[in-house]
């Protein structure tokens, strides 16, 4: 999959920096989104597992919300429809652009593992939430 800026990779082949990031799986997010673009029926497998708030990356949240709205409206959610939908809302560039959407669809092997990817995305979201609660100072009653 395409790695985005800010994912810990430096330019020009330098070593990857070890930055402490909250738990997430960009690969699971990308595979889930790509699978949904390839197979609209995969929505039924994942709708009860994951929501847009579970995605770590903002662009993935936007893409997931757009897919959800298209599916709820009975529309196809392939690359063309998704890019048109996001463009009309002036969110296409924030979602990574047409090229990123095409990459998601083209580099995803299919939708067979959509529920497994959704479970990973949800699990990492729950871990992030737990870390937030653990790191908050306790307040006396």
Predicted segments — roles?
Residues 1-126:
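Noncatalytic partner-interaction/assembly domains of nucleic-acid and motor enzyme complexes
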Residues 132-141:
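Single conserved hydrophobic/aromatic residue that forms the stacking wall/gate
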């Amino acid at each position: 999959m395409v790695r985005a800026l800010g994912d810990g990779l430096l330019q020009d082949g330098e070593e990857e920096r070890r930055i402490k990031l909250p738990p997430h799986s960009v690969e699971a997010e990308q595979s889930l989104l790509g699978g949904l673009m390839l197979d609209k029926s995969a929505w039924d497998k994942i709708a009860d597992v994951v929501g847009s708030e579970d995605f770590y990356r903002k662009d993935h949240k936007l893409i997931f919300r757009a897919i959800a709205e298209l599916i709820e409206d009975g529309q196809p959610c392939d690359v063309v429809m998704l890019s048109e939908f996001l463009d009309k809302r002036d969110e296409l560039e924030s979602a990574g652009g047409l090229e990123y959407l095409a990459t998601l669809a083209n580099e995803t092997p299919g939708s067979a593992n959509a529920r497994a990817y959704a479970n990973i995305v949800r699990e990492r979201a729950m871990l992030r939430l737990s870390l937030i609660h653990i790191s908050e100072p306790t307040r006396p009653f």
